[in-house]
């Protein structure tokens, strides 16, 4: 399994808008890609920091997923009021109970 992790610093008062954008944009876009496994959005309501995680069954699916969710991810980042470019990293999941 493979993961894409996006870390964004935004505005605490925009967390709910970011959640809505992630839930209604990023997740459906990711779900449309063969090999999609799961998506998570972690949020710190005090600081406005958000971490989006998508899980994929292969590296190829992760690459296709990046293309599929690019527009929706940009909208979610904008909804959070991010003032900087997010950090995006990719990993192999080496232990999981999913």
Question: Predicted regions span which residues?
Answer:
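Short S/T/G/P-rich N-terminal loop/turn motif that feeds into the first structured element of a domain
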Residues: 1-51, 57-71, 78-98
């Amino acid at each position: 399994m493979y993961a894409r992790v996006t870390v964004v610093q935004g505005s605490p008062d925009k967390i709910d808008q970011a959640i809505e954008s992630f839930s209604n944009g990023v997740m459906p876009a990711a779900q449309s890609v063969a090999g999609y496994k799961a998506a998570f959005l972690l949020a710190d309501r005090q600081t406005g920091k958000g971490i989006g995680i998508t899980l994929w069954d292969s590296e190829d699916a992760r690459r296709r997923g990046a293309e599929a969710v690019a527009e929706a991810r940009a909208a979610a980042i904008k909804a959070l009021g991010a003032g900087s470019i997010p950090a995006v990293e990719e990993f192999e999941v080496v232990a999981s109970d999913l």
